[in-house]
Design a protein with these regions (language model features):
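Gram-negative outer-membrane assembly/targeting C-terminal domains
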Residues: 113-132
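Active-site beta-strand/loop architecture of penicillin-binding DD-peptidases
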Residues: 1-4, 10, 16-119
Length: 132
């Protein structure tokens, strides 16, 4: 990949390395999708808060109405050394990006890059009636 914008080549390489660690690093928030990938993925997980949590309060998903639960986000590109696909996945009220949105992105990238998305990916998405 070639750097663009106002970043130096060194800064660009650091960013790509860090994004790759999100998926392939030991403590990466999307490491669950990278362990058996036949190509390197660079990505970033995210969670978008829907309902504000007041000072002194804590967010408890099981006690939050489904329509007020956090959105799950994941953006990625692959293969890192020769990018051919970029994806952005948003799962409304899905929870965490690494466990919900990232597996969906991996399936999309597998299908595009190797023509086989493999077995279905299990994601835990909230169901109606989990909260009031």
């Amino acid at each position: 990949m070639q750097p663009s914008g106002t970043y130096t080549p060194e800064q660009f390489e650091i960013m790509v390395h860090n994004l790759t660690d999100v998926v392939h690093g030991e403590g990466g928030t999307a490491r669950g999708i990278g362990w058996n990938a036949p190509y390197k993925i660079a990505g970033k997980t995210g969670t978008a808060q829907v309902k504000g949590v007041g000072q002194g309060e804590s967010y408890v998903e099981s006690r939050t109405a489904e329509h007020l639960r956090d959105h799950a986000l994941f953006i990625a590109f692959a293969p890192v050394d020769d990018p051919q696909i970029a994806v952005a996945v948003i799962v409304e009220n899905g929870g965490h990006g690494g466990s919900v949105a990232a597996p969906i992105a991996r399936k999309l990238m597998d299908q595009y890059l190797i023509g086989n998305a493999g077995p279905a990916v299990k994601v835990s998405v909230p169901t109606s009636g989990d909260a009031d």
